[in-house]
């Protein structure tokens, strides 16, 4: 199966320029995907382009990841409703280094093979290009009529858009077009890939290559990822799902994939994993037979968490997930780092208690019925303890008068109280 056939069955092709597949079948070639460096981490919205490069390399071709250092200082108007914040060079370089470390989990940069991946930054070839030189060498080859016909430009100039379009952003497609020309000349790059909203910018590049060098270059885009319910992919109430564990814990990352709908799971597992058709078909059959077991979601969450983080991080995320369902021990609870602990218990009621009350030791009855109102009265607490219905840090409480001290704290500032089987309360000691 060739690269285009691979993407096609995975549902990863939106538009493809005629002749692309034939060109790829002739032998090894290079393709690039542009990556926005405005943060020091990729988020899952970037992963479709990254997976396209991964499949490209696995098919024997050479992937190029282009960090948009120069274009990131400007902002792409494609399908965005407002101009964006511009970044300085030091920040962009830092972000580039962080992004490369993440890309290395998907692409082989270090191989001696001729198709080893390469990372480039368009700031390196744009920073010394004078404005006069650029408009003379590049601007004269692309007409304003051609640029105005792009959907991204039309949308920003429409009556519905209150922001208009700055000249800076209008020039973006020329810069992206020049990137393609530069890589065509210097890296033998004949294909640019991206999301379907990038088609206009990509074809500006193929047109520039044709007009400047009389060359032939190609374009391929993937559909923008959506959710079955029409919601925005990759967003939660707390924002983006990042690949950096400091921004999104591996537990929260795992939970995001585990909780996608059945319809989305079948679509996403084709896009975001390397599982083959037979493996996915078998999972889909099992899902249809026993949807409550959610084999698609579980395998999707496993594959992508291991790829982005590690097998150890995945195992820890699964273990953390079991804590809410009563299958865990105090030892497992104590193994959680602070970020994961807060993610696991993000939705439970929280109480704040002064550290001085814990430092000297406080009885459980005073903690749960006086320092907090987890129990309405001390009598109610004692009765529930007697019935075996109270746990602290996943340990059943036998004595309502037991002392709770600093040694009991999780991550040195938390206590987890449990009433019955399902009611959790997080006590934060400050």
UniProtKB/Swiss-Prot annotation:
Aminoacyl-tRNA synthetase found in the keyword field: yes
Positions of short motif 'KMSKS' region: 232-236
Main location: cytoplasm
Domain S4 RNA-binding residue range list: 362-430
Keywords of this entry: Aminoacyl-tRNA synthetase, ATP-binding, Cytoplasm, Ligase, Nucleotide-binding, Protein biosynthesis, RNA-binding
InterPro entries in UniProt: aa-tRNA-synth_I_CS, aa-tRNA-synth_Ic, Rossmann-like_a/b/a_fold, S4_RNA-bd_sf, SYY-like_C, Tyr-tRNA-ligase, Tyr-tRNA-ligase_bac-type, Tyr-tRNA-ligase_bac_1
Subcellular location: Cytoplasm
Keyword Cytoplasm attributed: yes
Catalytic activity line of the entry: tRNA(Tyr) + L-tyrosine + ATP = L-tyrosyl-tRNA(Tyr) + AMP + diphosphate + H(+)
Binding site for ATP: 235
GO cellular component terms attached to this protein's record: cytosol
GO annotation (BP), single: tyrosyl-tRNA aminoacylation
Domain of life per record: Bacteria
Pfam families: SYY_C-terminal, tRNA-synt_1b
Motif ('HIGH' region): 37-46
EC number: 6.1.1.1
GO molecular function: ATP binding; RNA binding; tyrosine-tRNA ligase activity
Binding site for L-tyrosine: 32, 172, 176
NCBIfam families recorded: tyrS
Function according to Swiss-Prot or TrEMBL: Catalyzes the attachment of tyrosine to tRNA(Tyr) in a two-step reaction: tyrosine is first activated by ATP to form Tyr-AMP and then transferred to the acceptor end of tRNA(Tyr).
Family as reported in the entry's similarity comment: Belongs to the class-I aminoacyl-tRNA synthetase family. TyrS type 1 subfamily.
Quaternary structure and partners: Homodimer.
Protein name (record): Tyrosine--tRNA ligase
Source species of the chain: Porphyromonas gingivalis (strain ATCC 33277 / DSM 20709 / CIP 103683 / JCM 12257 / NCTC 11834 / 2561)
Gene label: tyrS
